[in-house]
Amino acid sequence: MHVSLRQLRVFEAVARHNSYTRAAEELHLSQPAVSMQVRQLEDEIGLSLFERLGKQVVLTEAGREVFHYSRAIGQSLREMEEVLESLKGVSRGSLRIAVASTVNYFAPRLMAIFQQRHSGIGLRLDVTNRESLVQMLDSNSVDLVLMGVPPRNVEVEAEAFMDNPLVVIAPPDHPLAGERAISLARLAEETFVMREEGSGTRQAMERFFSERGQTIRHGMQMTRNEAVKQAVRSGLGLSVVSLHTIELELETRRLVTLDVEGFPDRRQWYLVYRRGKRLSPAAGAFREFVLSEAARMHCRLG
């Protein structure tokens, strides 16, 4: 049997996402190219690895076995790469960082400073929501993650590096703008523009109100922070966002923060990686950079 690593890599991505389309997006391939790699793997093995249930693809019994071994092979290859990178030293190497979409408001500046100090290290930055970040940690397919609350269902190391205050935003002409000490009960009468399911900000927002016995009214749902802010500016509802995402809007008075009981909700950003993972010199250098530069970086962002 002649199975290629490329075939296994493509198969593993399809199996993780239960989708050829999402696998193609992750791997930066066309969907026909992904389908061809899976088909060639099935031909080599002599068994079907997926079956269709409606619009979703699911693993067959043979597919589940191949998925188990493909992940083990992938893990061994990543460990080999890390060992080889360690032999090169911190002046060289590659680094894959994944960040929550809200972190992306300061991540490029963070990466630029790090790149100036370590120009020989190649950086790849993935920006996605919390659900996808947890999947990346679970599959150990990323070196380091910058995110909000670390997952509980994956064994990870998590180190706080910056405050992440969540605030309630409204357009400047909203009736609650300028009011003091707004109660949560009063706020619950308003409609809220929501991030999508799987968003860390949405989960934090819903948890905050639930823990205080309040239910919020869901309005429009958006997959991007910029869309959420635009919807709030247009009067479609209030929202809860990270203070880091509205620096420009506050300066220009396009949005205002409301003085609400319990807000700002003081949270933190974390640097997260799989427990027991041997960090490459490049990953170790980035970790030390983030933790040591956090206070200075916070001042820049402020």
Curated annotation (Swiss-Prot):
HTH lysR-type domain boundaries: 1-60
Listed Pfam families: HTH_1 (PF00126), LysR_substrate (PF03466)
DNA-binding region: 20-39
Keyword Transcription: yes
Gene Ontology molecular function terms on file: DNA-binding transcription factor activity; transcription cis-regulatory region binding
Keywords associated with the record: Activator, DNA-binding, Transcription, Transcription regulation
Matching SUPFAM superfamilies: Periplasmic binding protein-like II (SSF53850), Winged helix' DNA-binding domain (SSF46785)
PROSITE patterns, sorted: HTH_LYSR
Described function: Trans-acting transcriptional regulator of RuBisCO genes (rbcAB) expression.
Protein name: RuBisCO operon transcriptional regulator
Lineage start: Bacteria, Pseudomonadati, Pseudomonadota, Gammaproteobacteria, Chromatiales
Gene: rbcR
